[in-house]
Amino acid sequence: MLKYLNARVASSPCLLLVVVLLVLTSSTSCSLFGTHKKVSIPPLLPRVNGTREQMIQEVNRLASIKSIHGKLDIQFEDTSFASFGIAEKYRQVDGNLTLQRPGKIFLALQFTIVDIAQMASDGEHFAVAILQGDEKYKRFVKGTNSAVYSRLDRNGDSAPATNSKQKGEKQTVSALSNLRPQHLTDAFMIRPIDLNAGFIYSLSEFFQEEADTRPNKKGSRVMRGYYLLEELSAPKDGETSVLRRFWFDRVDRIRLARLQTFDGRGQIVTDVSYFDEKPIGSGETVSLPSRIELTRPQDQYKISLSYQDPTSVDLNKDWPPQAFVLQNKWQLPEVDLDAEKPKKLTSNQ
């Protein structure tokens, strides 16, 4: 019998392997499976549950704001070299902002109490006046909101800055020369969700590891839960596309934390993050984000905007149409972007 078993084992490598494994596991099972090592992982923050209807209601609450007027701290980052892990952050400037639905904006920018730029849009067309910096930057630019333009040409020699103030001013003007006023309108004045507009809305959850922003938790990492509410186009030929993606933070309560918009190719047009929600308004207050970060990957910039004094912001005031008209009273050289080349229209600008 022993000879028969030995013969079977010798003739079957698979059977031999099984026998060896049985011997090993029977003699070392305790040490093999009893050994363990504790590792630290980011804790999952407590989260609340919500419904699609609740999130749509929150978007439309924010979208109920008709106008905003207030002073801002604005910081601009040029992300042209983001693929190399480099971004240029420019000096903070002061902004005087007026917004009104639908899509109207006026923004005046100052650097150390000097006017450096003004820009406006009536919802269809925009104008930007660059008032400081090198002569190659001083100009009055006009265009159409729904058009896509390449970055303005910055070629040309410039005189070296004689001090740090001049250097900071030149860098800031250079960075702001390609900012378009209509880029800010949807970030502040979110478009409402209309369930009768033919769009499809899909809800899912998402978990993301990120820095812990709670007090006394500097340097820590946490796992934060989100709801993703996606606005999809009506199906056509069996296909649909994402138009907007709303991120809702689930920690403590349901809060709109991020909004992404997409073009027809599925590429991100705008990526807006909302922070530090608090009562905003000089009279009747509304709970709104007090800091907004807007990233435009295709335009290669990021801009951070914070209210200087949330209690002095005017909400829901009616502004006349002329408040959003910018005239070239400085007699700057004019650049008509529509006249230089045919404009390419897109539906997600």
Which residue stretches match the model-derived regions?
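N-terminal secretory signal peptides that target proteins for export/translocation
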Residues: 1-11
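An acidic-aromatic
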Residues: 102-183
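N-terminal leader/targeting segments and the immediate start of mature chains
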Residues: 30-90, 168-178, 339-349
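Bacterial N-terminal signal peptides
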Residues: 13-27
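Post-signal peptide N-terminal segment of secreted/secretory-pathway proteins
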Residues: 32, 74-126, 132-133, 345-346
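Gly/Pro-enriched, hydrophobic low-complexity segments
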Residues: 31-34, 177, 191-194, 198-331, ...
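Edge/loop elements at the starts and ends of beta-strands within beta-rich repeat scaffolds
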Residues: 59-68, 88-90, 98-102, 119-121, ...
